[in-house]
Amino acid sequence: MSTVADTRLLPGKPVRARILSEVSAYVNQVGRIGKLVSISIGNVPEVAVYVRNQARAASAVGVPFDQQLWDRSISQEVCQSLIREMNDDPDVLGIILQRPVPDHINVRALQAAIHPLKDVEGMNPASIGNIVYNDVAMAPCTAAAAIELIRETGLSMAGLEVVMVGHSEIVGKPVAMMLMAEGATVTVCHHMTRSDAMHSRRADVVVVAVGKAHLIGPDMIKPGAVVIDIGINHVPGPDGPVVVGDVQTDAVKDVAGWITPVPGGVGLVTVAILLRNAIRAHQQQRAAGWIH
């Protein structure tokens, strides 16, 4: 049953609070837990904001957080060597690779270098592949956050008609696979889809992750549908740039049954999922005999 008071808006704050409470309780129960290591390659201000948010949330639930800033000139080989050392370090619970990275760095190769049991972001190819087999224990954080918010509506996933607008490896494809694992019927729209609206107008749930401000309008949404807006865009405002999603929120909320705000929706839950993945990593590492 939904805990949301306003059925038009589906904020991330209560979901985030619940997940972080569960993480905190687990950390208190086990007593001692390894650290999360955040890797930033080069000094990117936007990345620094994400790292601060992650560090603050980790501190609040008692998970040690090590922020590492590597020089942007570091080589691919040195990066992979350092990651392998972390894989072998029992004091490292999980590894977070911040993006973007410099052009000379192959981000996929670094994601693949992170051991699946320390892949708290869920971006190792093995972690992505596990979703196909309905194993979503370490799913990509943003995708898992979107699923968590759909659950918050109280709707049963089984048989739900869902349209996923966007098919990125980080969000769109994992969301689609995770929803299929839950029994939903999923249609994925992308840049070659002839008409997004033709599909979205019949959907019970529309999830949007494209990176185009105000792409989805009220004429594209079925009355009463759930709209999960994952987009983050910066557009000019009267007092400077403002953050908006891929959905025309004010107009669409008059049609939709539930809609996530931007900011304050999926993004808030994403960091909580990262920390939930951390305790799942701890459970899996303990089951594998890595830690006691």
From Swiss-Prot:
Keyword Electron transport set for record: no
GO cellular component: cytosol
GO molecular function: methenyltetrahydrofolate cyclohydrolase activity; methylenetetrahydrofolate dehydrogenase (NADP+) activity
Keyword Electron transport listed: no
Annotated binding of NADP(+), by residue: G166, H167, S168, I232
A Pfam family the protein falls into: THF_DHG_CYH_C
E.C. code: 1.5.1.5, 3.5.4.9
Biochemical pathway: One-carbon metabolism; tetrahydrofolate interconversion
Gene3D superfamilies associated with the record: Leucine Dehydrogenase, chain A, domain 1, NAD(P)-binding Rossmann-like Domain
Family matches, as InterPro entries: Aminoacid_DH-like_N_sf (IPR046346), NAD(P)-bd_dom_sf (IPR036291), THF_DH/CycHdrlase (IPR000672), THF_DH/CycHdrlase_cat_dom (IPR020630), THF_DH/CycHdrlase_NAD-bd_dom (IPR020631)
GO biological process terms on file: L-histidine biosynthetic process; methionine biosynthetic process; purine nucleotide biosynthetic process; tetrahydrofolate interconversion
Record's subunit section: Homodimer.
Cited HAMAP family: THF_DHG_CYH (MF_01576)
Protein purpose: Catalyzes the oxidation of 5,10-methylenetetrahydrofolate to 5,10-methenyltetrahydrofolate and then the hydrolysis of 5,10-methenyltetrahydrofolate to 10-formyltetrahydrofolate.
Name under which the protein is recorded: Bifunctional protein FolD 2
Gene name of this polypeptide: folD2
